[in-house]
């Protein structure tokens, strides 16, 4: 073989060898690419799991915030109701002396018809907002509802009893606005 033939053969052999190497490399690269895709899928699954956990945490946070806001609204509504009752009580306390004066006039004399109509309307208006009077002669004495101004010993009673009402007591719903001022009969003894 001549040198040139030998050189050509070597070059062909090298080209074939290079071609085989490229082919193998491409084949490895292709199979590596498949391997890389499955490796990419694993982080994607982990990422999805992380996103799901984060989403669950956000849902929990949202539920807590909603509950906190609901509790805030309920507390605010209750506070507003307490404030309304307090304001209503203050207004009623200002009007009570007028009702007391009318009650005294009725007790000791008669009201003219126009004044009687005004008193009736005023009492009706107070009842509409929930104001009720209490304290009648013969009622058992209750220190939570009655303020004893005088005590009269009496053999006729077994327990402390309201003998006379000086000023009626008033309740707004369940709340005592003013205790009734009374004279109490107490058992002798």
Swiss-Prot record:
Q: Does the keyword Nucleotidyltransferase apply?
A: no
Listed A to Z, the keywords are:
Chaperone, Cytoplasm, Stress response
GO cellular component: a single term: cytoplasm
Query: Is Nucleus a UniProt keyword of this protein?
Result: no
Q: Which InterPro entries match?
A: GrpE (IPR000740), GrpE_coiled_coil (IPR013805), GrpE_head (IPR009012)
Which segments carry the region annotation Disordered?
1-54
GO molecular function per UniProt: adenyl-nucleotide exchange factor activity; protein homodimerization activity; protein-folding chaperone binding; unfolded protein binding
- Biased composition of type Basic and acidic residues is found at 1-38
Q: Name one GO biological process term.
A: protein folding
The record's family statement is: Belongs to the GrpE family.
Described by its record, this protein's role is as follows:
Participates actively in the response to hyperosmotic and heat shock by preventing the aggregation of stress-denatured proteins, in association with DnaK and GrpE. It is the nucleotide exchange factor for DnaK and may function as a thermosensor. Unfolded proteins bind initially to DnaJ; upon interaction with the DnaJ-bound protein, DnaK hydrolyzes its bound ATP, resulting in the formation of a stable complex. GrpE releases ADP from DnaK; ATP binding to DnaK triggers the release of the substrate protein, thus completing the reaction cycle.
The entry's protein name is: Protein GrpE
């Amino acid at each position: 073989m001549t040198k040139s033939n030998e050189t050509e053969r070597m070059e062909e052999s090298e080209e074939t060898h290079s071609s085989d190497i490229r082919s193998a490399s491409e084949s490895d690269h292709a199979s590596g690419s498949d391997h890389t895709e499955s490796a990419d899928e694993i982080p994607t699954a982990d990422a999805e799991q992380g996103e799901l956990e984060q989403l669950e945490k956000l849902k929990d946070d949202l539920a807590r915030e909603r509950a906190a806001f609901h509790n805030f609204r309920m507390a605010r509504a209750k506070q507003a109701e307490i404030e309304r009752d307090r304001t209503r009580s203050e207004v009623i306390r200002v009007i009570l002396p007028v009702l007391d004066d009318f009650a005294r006039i009725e007790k000791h004399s008669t009201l003219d018809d126009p004044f009687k109509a005004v008193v009736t309307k005023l009492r009706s208006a107070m009842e509409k907002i929930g104001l009720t009077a209490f304290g009648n002669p013969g009622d058992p004495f209750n220190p939570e509802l009655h303020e004893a101004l005088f005590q009269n010993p009496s053999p006729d009673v077994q327990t402390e009893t309201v003998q006379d009402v000086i000023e009626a007591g008033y309740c707004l719903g369940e709340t005592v606005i003013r205790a009734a001022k009374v004279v109490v009969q107490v058992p002798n003894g």
